[in-house]
Amino acid sequence: EDEYEGGVWWEELLYVETETTCIDSVAPLITTKWGQCYPWNNGFPVDNGETCPTGCVAVAMAQLLNYLHGAIGKPSGLYHDAYISGYRNGSNYHLDISLSNYVDNSPRWLQMPVDMYDQNIAFARNLMIDVGYRFEIEYTADGSGADVSTSKIANYGISCTKGEYDYSTLLSNLQAGLPVLVTAYRTENKVLGITVGFSNGHCWILDGWRRERTRQRAYTRLHRIEITLDDYDWLREDSESYYLPEDIYTWYPDAYDGAIECSGDSYSDSVYWMMNWGYDGVYDNVKYGTYSGAPWKTSSDRNYKYKRRFYYGFN
């Protein structure tokens, strides 16, 4: 059998060089990192000897109100004196909230703490007590919760729209400097296969967006293999594995056995949401998918994927 002049070539992948950069973004609008437990809940109701958390609604709304005061001038004032006490013992539940000394255009807005290590924790705590009163939060040791509605938000003189997921709408709000309030659940309750409700809910803020571009550059080593004329025809059918001489010299004019070649650059873009989860900044640096139904997790078993609702267009 005669040898096929020129042989055939194949490429060995050595490695892929990857570089990702952010090419456009809305930086997280909410800079505070508040939470539900100590020191934020100091003095809150006690459930069987355990201090109740302030509640995710209280944290999300308080951070949102703190931001909106600077962004749209609403709300203007704060109650400088806020008091909460109460207890839960079995079926016995008592709650007492007192708000007084309302100060219009309060200077405390500019003195709010950034995180749990900052000063003036009491200012943020008082605002969470205010939210607890207006949203009728029910306090328990396992979690303090309340329903969110546009009418409750309107108690602060702020109007907004409630809707389901729409990428363009949410992004346009962020680009206008307006965060989005989110509510969702991680458990779907079913009876005989029929959904009867949802549980394990959470309220948080969607406040940032990123567009990232990834460049990939592959490096390969060329190998030349001698073949016979009888092999030539079937090798033409296996072009995904082998290059014929006329092909290899088109791609790599100076090809030689053992040459290291670069395939050139390929680019792909990805977009992500950024969240403020109300857990003292934990999980806030995680990037979340923007497609409908994307996993929004704070841990492997805490995916808030059910009944997502969005409050936006604050004015």
Protein language model features and the residues they cover:
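Short loop/turn segments at secondary-structure transitions that flank enzyme active sites
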Residues: 62, 67, 71, 188, ...
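Extracellular hydrolytic enzyme modules, especially secreted metalloproteases
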Residues: 135-151, 156-157, 278-284
